[in-house]
Amino acid sequence: MARYLGPKLKLSRREGTDLFLKSGVRAIDTKCKLEQAPGQHGARKPRLSDYGVQLREKQKVRRIYGVLERQFRNYYKEATRLKGNTGENLLSLLEGRLDNVVYRMGFGATRAESRQMVSHKAIMVNGRVVNIASYQVSPNDVVSVREKSKKQSRIKAALELAEQREKPTWLEVDAVKMEGVFKRIPERADLSADINEHLIVELYSK
């Protein structure tokens, strides 16, 4: 499945919630009708079956983290092999992706921009360049912006935006040095309550 390159607001309207695909910190529901699906018949919201609800939740989470279907299924399989709650394990794996950590630290305005920074070799982990967006960051890893990339205006703009967002407690960031420490794997209480991972587990358990 190819990566979606169309309008970002359309995806948020499809899922009925802000997927944080745009760089602004203001909720996008002020500029588009999130409760109304895109398209000519978007106002007619059909009642979803249990399967439909589960599928929509999976699509929502997959789009939030910018992960393709096959990748997402592989994350789920890995989550089932780990000890503990499968749904929480899934979210932990997604949060540990390098592109997501770069976004959470504020070096990229969106996850898509952060993914591009990683692929363009602008990010280092423990002093070594890593250009794989799905690289799993471990506790105590140091993630930093490469020296020659620090002058990029988009990084400075992203850091300014990040100042307006709630700071993740599982990260320690030095905005001046443009580096941060992944102190620990986030707990479920640290993450968005708008995600219902249990629906995803139910979907894949069938």
From Swiss-Prot:
Residues 96-156 form the S4 RNA-binding domain. GO terms for biological process: ribosomal small subunit biogenesis; translation. GO terms for molecular function: rRNA binding; structural constituent of ribosome. It comes from the Bacteria. It holds the Pfam family Ribosomal_S4. Keywords: Ribonucleoprotein, Ribosomal protein, RNA-binding, rRNA-binding. InterPro entries: Ribosomal_uS4 (IPR022801), Ribosomal_uS4_bac-type (IPR005709), Ribosomal_uS4_CS (IPR018079), Ribosomal_uS4_N (IPR001912), S4_RNA-bd (IPR002942), S4_RNA-bd_sf (IPR036986). GO terms for cellular component: small ribosomal subunit. Part of the 30S ribosomal subunit. Contacts protein S5. The interaction surface between S4 and S5 is involved in control of translational fidelity. NCBIfam families: PRK05327.1, rpsD_bact. One of the primary rRNA binding proteins, it binds directly to 16S rRNA where it nucleates assembly of the body of the 30S subunit. With S5 and S12 plays an important role in translational accuracy. Belongs to the universal ribosomal protein uS4 family. This is Small ribosomal subunit protein uS4. It comes from Photorhabdus laumondii subsp. laumondii (strain DSM 15139 / CIP 105565 / TT01).
